[in-house]
Each structure stands twice: as structure tokens, then as C-alpha cells.
Amino acid sequence: MAAIKDHPALYGYFLRDEPLPAAFPMLAEWAERIRKADGGEHPLYLNLLPSFVDSVALTCNYREYVRRFISEVKLPMVSFDFYPVTFNGITKDYWYDNLQIVYEESEAAGLPFWAFALSTAHDPYPLPTMASLRLELYTALAYGAQGLQYFTYWNPGTETWNFHEAPINQDKQRSEAYYLVQQMNKELQARAYVFLNSKVVSIAHVGDDMYKGCKRMEDLPPHVVSLSTGSAGAVVSLLEKGSWNYLVVVSRTLDAPTDLNVEFGSKAWTIDREGNAVKLAKGPNTFSIEPGDVAIFKFRK
């Protein structure tokens, strides 16, 4: 560590990926040793398992798994992976519940949480699309994520999972995924001011189906007169930052556009892909949200 701890290219230390609870004491010990050797100048990081892992393997339920990690390992953030888009569609029965648990536990501990999008195809996950990247990342942001990650950049050097067409693919060339991620990042950076250091006020769902962990929207957010979508529904998140509220409505489907009808009782603006605030006309407004995409609005508290 003495050779690298002052290097300008060093951001932090990666402890390990997807540990079981039995490893937490050892990881806590290693974290403390690294902090002492580093002088506390760089963050430490590891990534947790998703919620569909069997509770027998975890030796506890998922909420307790996250809670134990926070209390025992004591890292500055909570990171987890869950890739909801498979060849069979979106794994909605677990994904939203996973996000809700991680949001609640990290919020209770006063820690930010980080989430992933899948940029590398492997069994049973298809090639990424703009729709799948938007769905994963904007949904995470709606749940309060403060860090976004991609799995992975280079094509992993293993045949176990049939990894292929990573942003830097198996031939060490830029793949189509590279340019999708590049476009996604540009879009995210333009709108980052909405999400960075914002606080979640409420998270709810609208639509015909309510999945595990989803809370149906019963009361409209402040200053919202009406809000409705088609049967596929959406995630509806209210964020606050300074004197502004941000209403974030994320599609829950990759199959078709989501029709959003919304009316505000005060002046409101929509945030376009370039991050510009465009004032809305008074009265009801109708939007067609592309598959996996988001509609973002701002209005004063």
C-alpha cells in the first residue's frame, strides 16, 4: 500500500464482490487495517448480493443481510447489484423490493447507496439497449441512488457465464454497448443536478400490478392535481433539494410507451434530456414516456 496510496490514479479500495454474512467480520478487519495504512484518505468499497439469493445461503433475510453489512463492515456507502432485464422480461417481483430495502436501510444509517446497470450480455441476460439502461438507472435514481455503476467495462476473462459484447468486447474493441453507455452517461450528467444530494420524500407505484415491495400511490404529491398512466404503470418518486421538488416518473416496461397525464396546481417545468427546464402549460399535460424512460418535473415547494 505504501507504493500506491499516494498515487493520483487511486480512488479507493475494492474489498470483494457479493460476500455472504459469514465474511463480514473478516472484511471489517481488513477495512480497518486498510484505513490505518491509508490514513483514511480513500474510500473502501464492496458490492452486496441481490435479494433473490436464498435466505438459507444468507443465513438471514435480505433486510437483515443489508443491516448487518452496514453495522459490521462500516463502509461509507451501500452498493448492490440486481440485473432485472433477462431474456424472460423484467424480474419485477424482486427488483423493486430490493431497491426499497436498500433505500430504507441506507437512509436509516445515513449512508448513500449505489446501484448497477448491466452493460455486458451473459446468460441469462441479453445485450443492453438504451431502454434497458434507462430503466435500470432512472429507477435506481428514483429510489434515491447516489452512485451509478455498470457491469462491466472490459469483457470478463471467463467462459463460465458466456460473457460477450462488453463495452470493450472480447476482441478488445469498442462494441455497440460502449456507445450506448456513452450516450447514457451524457444524458445522466445533463440531469445529474436533479438527483445528486437530493432527498427522497416518497416512493410509490401506479398501474394495475403491484409487485413485492411496491407501495401503491394513495395520495398525490404536493402541488400535483392529477396523475395517471396506462395499465403498465410507473414508479412515482418525489425528491426535494433546496427550495425545489422534483417529480420523477419512470416507466416499468420495455414493451411499449407509457402514457402519462399530469396536472400541477402551481408553476412547473419538465427537465429535458439536455437538462433544460421547459415550462409546462397550465392545465393537464400529456406525455408519452418511451419504454424504460423517465419524465422529470420540477416545481417549488
Language model segments and positions:
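Glycan-processing catalytic domains of CAZymes
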Residues: 1-266, 272-301
